[in-house]
Amino acid sequence: MAEKKKKRVLILGAAGRDFHNFNVFFRDNPEYEVVAFTATQIPDIEGRIYPPELAGELYPNGIPIWSEDDMEKIIKEHDIDVVVFAYSDVSHEHVMHLASRAHSAGADFWLLGPKSTMLKSSKPVVAVTAVRTGCGKSQTSRKVAQLLQEMGYKVVAIRHPMPYGDLRKQVVQRFATFEDLDKYECTIEEREEYEPYIERGMVVYAGVDYEKILREAEKEADIILWDGGNNDFPFYEPDLWIVVTDPHRPGHELKYHPGETNFRAADVIIINKIDTANRDDIQKVRESIEKVNPNATVIEAASPIFVDKPELIKGKRVLVVEDGPTLTHGGMKYGAGYVAAKKFGAAEIIDPRPYAVGSIIETYKKYPHLDVILPAMGYGKKQIKELEETINRADADVVIMGTPVDLRRFMNLNKPAVRVKYELEEIGQPKLKEVLEEWAKNCEKLKK
């Protein structure tokens, strides 16, 4: 009998979900041949190779990473049978336009779901995900970690991947000290996610091979905390699934992929930022919950800001630096730094655009909705340097850092800086603590 022809696959990604889907579904599957990955969202990832050490025995030369812009050309030149969509925080319309492009070039278009991609853990998994980037996952994850620790559990966090460097050195990364961040040459985006855990004395894992990461984390954890990325769904099967929504972007919970998946599957839905959102917009989110997930437990919360030196802001001309991804593909116009500038009486929030250099200029061209905010873009050493130069060139009295990471750890700034932090605070009932206690009481894995 003639050997069955392998299906030729192209995976559309952004150096995260795509690698995971490959590892768990395609890597050892002889029925498929993954011809290439494509890249978008993250600067400078196309042109790399997914290395043979990670790609497995079927791929002795590794797998190339090309630009998504060339999708139709790749489908035709390489006789692609199946295009697999594998990244997040995009509108449903964006996904379907890609599907139409794939179909018009002759290929099938797939979305792999939880059954094909979620790994099972021997330990209980609490997952924190969101409907969009910038909803408040980070402070929610921190709060969940703190509450579980106070209940006496050893919690280990595992963060959705951000593999921007040499993938071979990043198979399994364990962060317990600030030195570990330097050891793995972390970008600003990575530091923003890992530092808050380290500051709390916690261990956080990340990397490329999430099966290996899980098995390492299980050795030292009572409970695994999945800290999601963008609005993606978890890589691990959750025993408790918490999803954060944002009433500043009402309706997005049903319009963005795969955030709607999270929203529909959630055990607990947090409506965050209710202290700063419009009442009608909060109501729209509530109506969405009633419509598609009426059995979810709903918690209302605020994310109040705390500033280390508010006296430096009053009456000053300030440069506001905000979390990069929230403003770029998250689509927000401002973040915590802007709120702090207004709240503490800055005389003026300066326009950083005239002072931008290098790739920061390109960021403003790509995201024209940004005006008086400087997004903390730092996907590599060169970009971090360009961000530092932009900040130092800016004609301002003070820098307000609305970023989760303290930029002064790895930048020399020529003006005083104020750091803004934000924590999750529930409003009314139920509280997260009660929800977690009730869950822990009934969790079979914790009884073992």
Curated annotation (Swiss-Prot):
Gene3D superfamilies: NAD(P)-binding Rossmann-like Domain (3.40.50.720), P-loop containing nucleotide triphosphate hydrolases (3.40.50.300)
EC number: 6.3.-.-
Any single GO BP term: amino acid biosynthetic process
Pathway recorded for this protein: Amino-acid biosynthesis; L-proline biosynthesis; Amino-acid degradation; L-arginine degradation; Amino-acid biosynthesis; L-arginine biosynthesis
Catalytic activity annotation: L-arginine + ADP + phosphate + H(+) = L-citrulline + NH4(+) + ATP
GO molecular function: ATP binding; ligase activity
Domain of life where this protein originates: Archaea
The UniProt record lists the keyword Amino-acid biosynthesis: yes
UniProt entry keywords in alphabetical sequence: Amino-acid biosynthesis, ATP-binding, Ligase, Magnesium, Nucleotide-binding
Free-text disruption phenotype from the record: The deletion mutant cannot grow in the absence of proline in a medium based on amino acids. In the presence of proline, the deletion mutant can grow, but it shows a decrease in growth rate, suggesting that the catabolism of arginine by this enzyme makes a relevant contribution in ATP generation in this medium. The mutant, as the wild-type strain, cannot grow in this medium depleted of arginine.
Cofactor requirement: Mg(2+)
Reported pH dependence: Optimum pH is 7.5.
Reported function: Arginine deiminase involved in an arginine synthetase pathway, which provides citrulline and ornithine, the precursors for proline biosynthesis. Catalyzes the conversion of L-arginine to citrulline while conserving the energy of arginine deimination to generate ATP from ADP and free phosphate. Is specific toward L-arginine and cannot use D-arginine, agmatine, guanidine, L-alanine-L-arginine dipeptide and L-arginine-L-alanine dipeptide. Can also use CDP, GDP or UDP, with lower activity (38%, 8.4% and 13.3%, respectively).
Subunit comment: Probably forms homotetramers and higher assemblies of tetramers.
Name of the protein this chain belongs to: Arginine synthetase ArcE
